[in-house]
Amino acid sequence: MVKLRFYVTTPIYYVNDKPHIGSFYTTLIADILARWHRLKGEEVFFLTGTDENSQKNVEAAKNAGKEVREYVDEMARIWQETWRMLDISSDDFVRTTEDRHQKAVYGFFRRVLERGDIYKGKYVGYYCVGCEAFLTKQDLVDGKCLIHKTEPMALEEENYFFAASRYK
């Protein structure tokens, strides 16, 4: 009989601040799923981690009077320790600043680029730093983000796009 496999991951969290109830809730749900599948005898891999490459992290480091790497290292330790204290049963904790993560992403990117699945194009939009997202004009009220009440940055930048339409 083939042993069933189950993979669960949380979002990789921004480390601009300490974990909060929302991040705990998401991680707890993933932990419950992982434990349930382990109880059923399935082979489980549960991944969580931190995204240390965001504008929010840069701003938080600046506000704390620290270099970005120093700040994200400190915050990543807090996130890892929090999950340990809460007995989260993850099998791995990945940080986007780790060599292994960067090598894996580079390898994946290179493969899809070679297949022609990645192409360069121009993206024009309104970027809200607070939301860490691009907004449309319809998302704005009086030219401001509805959530943060701030004017988003008008950005035009060259980006890489994934040709998802090939995989319909």
What is the meaning of each model-derived region?
Residues 2-168:
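N-terminal, positively charged nucleic-acid-binding surface of large information/translation enzymes
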